[in-house]
Amino acid sequence: AASDVYKRQATHGEPSENNAHPHASDDGNVVAVHNGIIENYQELKDKLVRKGYTFYSETDTEVAVKLIDYYYKKYEGTPVDAINHALVRIRGSYALAIMFRDYPEEIYVARKDSPMILGVANGESYIGSDVPAILKYTRDVYYIGNQEMARVRKGEITFYNLDGEEIEKELKTVEWDAEAAEKSGYEHFMIKEIHEQPKAVLDTLNSVIKDGMIDLSEVGLSEEEIKEISRIYIVACGSAYHVGVAAQYVMEDLARIPVRVELASEFRYRNPILDPKGLVVIISQSGETADSLAALRESKKQGVKTLGIVNVIGSSIAREADNVYYTLAGPEIAVATTKAYSTQLIAAYTLAIQFAKIRGQITEEQYAGYIEELQSIPEKIQRIIEDKERLQWFASKQVNAKDIFFIGRGIDYAISLEGSLKMKEISYIHSEAYAAGELKHGTISLIEEGTLVIGVLTQPELYEKTLSNMVECKSRGAYLMGLTTFGHYNIEENADFSVYIPKTDPHFATSLAVIPLQLLGYYVSVAKGLDVDKPRNLAKSVTVE
């Protein structure tokens, strides 16, 4: 059997039955699935409409299928001839798997700038986008080159170039070294850890949600203590600080407790005035971050209650804090955090929801609704990760960027901060995050022809405001990328490139919107040939001051 391990996220047209793969020609003679983006699909579609083809979906894939069908019928040649004729006319990226009714025992594949791997074992053939997809079936693989195609039969694969000439390929055996085995076949720890986020988030949720209710008994905060909290101080460094910025909006809005977020390296040196009934929340993946640990000790010295949100069990912050919320991200190896960050967000959300309920700020119905929405986050993150080829394509165009600006308001500003850090720390491209309303106070003078500006628009009431800021940037020559939720398609009137995430409660948007920005930073770094997992001059756990 030939097996195609396949899942795809919507790129052209939103997710729907009509837009779902596989796509077929009008008479069902040709069917295909496709990863990638066909840049000139509208032009090809118009040509096919003139030739009498009708279209039932909004996808670029349907265009590819019907183009292949057109040349198959026009020249009455082989599938290889038809695919060749079609592919030389397609601009963009693709990994295609195609079947013809006349050749039921064969699958034809082709790739350009989108990942694909072929495997064989025991008279069977496998098609996948990367090694981990087929590893449980076989270790014997062919690496199909860029702008090459292949005919896949049971246990037999023949390769061709785009002129239709047969080419030889060497069968390779995948042999992981110890480190690669830890990476489970992924090229870098960072992309592995991005893929582990749905599980890490789910594990963290399951650790505190019991029978549809949030249970903080293992964290250690009692209901009486929660009712007495007068204000919250969130203290952290780096990405954990960005979690704090997002948490501030969520906690203040839901629990109606004043929140201050501060960098640990600033907090510890300013002789802070802390409310005796306050709660100091220290966020740290390693639990050893020097400045955060010093901030914790300063808070305890003043007699203020402390809560550590940490990933490493038994770490210094975990041992010394009065209460500990463990994020269950598992070991994180890449210097640039992804899954630890995502689990820290979940910790902040669950604290905010529980505080809001105990303090009578939300109804039982709202409480249940928020918990239900949180439980849908892992699956929504998974859907975004499956759309990674589209971001890979966009990232490849940004390798020569000199400056990138991320803009947003409210929670979208918190998302921008993390997106900007991911970009600069691993791709070494100068990037800044700005509250969108601050652009007019000087920043906009930095926008030049071609400067990439990424607008984050997940908050419905702030959408129009941020969009108008993006338009201001465009009028000064900026190249715009918009990051928003499905449904806001009018962004395409102004943005040069748009990324859509599933809808969620706006309080929790950071968990979804950060994923495309992690992928963007990762793929720009890969395209530049950099050491993604160990960026220059950075360490995983910052134990120095």
Residue ranges and their predicted role:
Residues A1-K183, E187-H188, K199-S230, Y269, ...:
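Conserved short alpha-helical segments that host acidic/polar catalytic motifs at enzyme active sites
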Residues K7-N18, V208-E224, A247-I283, T289, ...:
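Glycine-rich oxoanion-binding loops at beta->alpha junctions
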Residues Q9-H12, G28, I37-E39, R101-P104, ...:
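Short, glycine-/Ser/Thr-/acidic-enriched flexible segments
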Residues N35-E39, V109-L118, Y186-M190, V201, ...:
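Conserved phosphate/anionic-ligand binding catalytic regions in large, soluble enzymes, centered on
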Residues G164, Y479, N494, T504-E545:
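Generic C-terminus detector
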Residues Q197-V201, L205-Y233, N323-L452, S525-E545:
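Active-site phosphate/pyrophosphate-binding segments
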Residues K227-G369, E373-S376, V456-P502, L520, ...:
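Glycine-rich phosphate-binding loops that contact phosphosugars or nucleotide phosphates
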